[in-house]
Amino acid sequence: MKIKNILPIAIMVLLPFGGGWMGMTSCVSDDTTLPTRPLSEINIDGGIEALYNINKNETLRIKPALSQTNQPKTVTYTWEVDQQVYSHEEEFTYPAKELGTFQCRLIVENEDGKTFFPFTVNVNSPYEEGIALLSQQPDGTSMLSFMLTPSNGGPRSFTTGDCFSVNNPDLTFSPRCIDMVQSSGSLILACQGALPSASGAAQPVASSPSSGNGAAPTIYYLNEKTLVAENVVPVTEYDDFVPTRLVIPSVGASGVAYPILCENGSVYEFSTTEGAISKPTNFRYKYAQTCLAHDDGGAGWSFDLVFWDKEKGDLCDLYSGYGPYYCSTKYLLVRDSVNAQTNYFANNDIVKIVGIDLTAKQKRTDKSEMLILTKNAFLTRKTILSTGFWEYDASAGAAKLWDNGGTSTACIGTNIINEQTPCVANKTYYSLLFGDKNQVRRWNYATSQSLDKADVLQTFGSDRAIVTDLVLSADHLTTYVAFYEPDQTGLNGSVYVISTDTGEILERYDNVCYRPVKMIYKKK
């Protein structure tokens, strides 16, 4: 006699049992004749975890190991991501294209029942925090590299290939990248575009997927977590727009236009919220190729943008959108009032403007300062100024120029620093580190040490190597040094990490880029 048996639903928590996994088994309709046929239950024995952490652009692959309690039967697979069917393949292949947390489930079934395995995939940013680096090939082709600082303190390595092209496959990276800042959730990049030919037309660079043939000067907004371009601003309306410095604070404000310094000393203004380039309203003259953008990381309205006015021969500061005001013992001196008597730096030329970096602890108690190097004939002078020039003097009941006691001699004779020299200064060791050919030298700016007698802190590469950029760690204990070998082809750029105090080489990352042009430490 034929008897129809309905097997009960068995619900079990997913726990390891006897070397395998027990799951949830659905009810089965059994139309066989007596005696009852034994079921072949599915066990997930391994090859799959409850939690995965991967980085964007990585591919997760999962191939579970299965067993069946009785005679093996044909099984089918269903992979779900956020309650949507993703695949029916035996192996789960998941290219991580978006950041976030994704709830997933594996369903394996045969004719006797089903087994479920839920799991979570966290897709993290491979660009969360670390070194971002722009470099150029000899033909001008741009490249963006990144080295992640792992949260667990594990080993570090640079990405392979151009991060811009990887994350923006439909865009060409404009040639001759030159500067980069992190501001209000974005990495803002500046590229000078293709070199002009003798006829004035854009001169193409060698063809490659990222060469940007014939590209105009371009400003890019990249999402700081994904490096995906959120705004691309090609600039074709101004013939002399060849950017060299993005003078933009770390926090932008709506409605504020920030300066972009160009190769010929002119300045254009750029709205970070509107992505528009315009003629300047604040900096309308010619300026030296050394400047400073300083802010406290707070509100976007609190910043100092410091330039050297070449015609007036004086520093000027756009303070939180006001000014620019010129450096003088006279408070809030405007340009029309600058003369030999009011100009603090009268009869001097600029050598270098360097912000003096502070640790988080120092920022709570110390003034924000900058080191100013100027020259007059064979005499180089140093001045330590407040980034805002003036500080309130309670005893006088008024604002006074804060110049740390005034100007003093840095060196007599040949000056070994110029506007283009890579420099970093810190308050921890009261030292200025600067690149000099294939060396990093250290000058104790708070002492009477002559600048031309600065110590050699470390030497890099061959005798022909050139140091192009320096970046301090947040605690000042280490310094990142970017350099390249001009006689080498291909990836001829390297980054080393040294002790800021002793110069000892702590980490080496050889041949990770082309000629480095800009390096920053990208914060979370």
Residue positions per predicted region:
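Bacterial N-terminal signal peptides that target proteins for export
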Residues: 2-13
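Acidic/polar, low-complexity intrinsically disordered N-terminal segments immediately downstream
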Residues: 4, 28-167, 190, 474-476, ...
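C-terminal motif of bacterial Sec signal peptides marking the signal peptidase cleavage site
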Residues: 23-26
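Beta-propeller domains
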Residues: 136-173, 191-229
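Acidic, serine/threonine- and glycine-rich low-complexity intrinsically disordered segments
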Residues: 197, 205-436
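Conserved blade-ending motifs and adjacent loop-strand segments that build the rim/top face
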Residues: 403-419, 451-475, 504-517
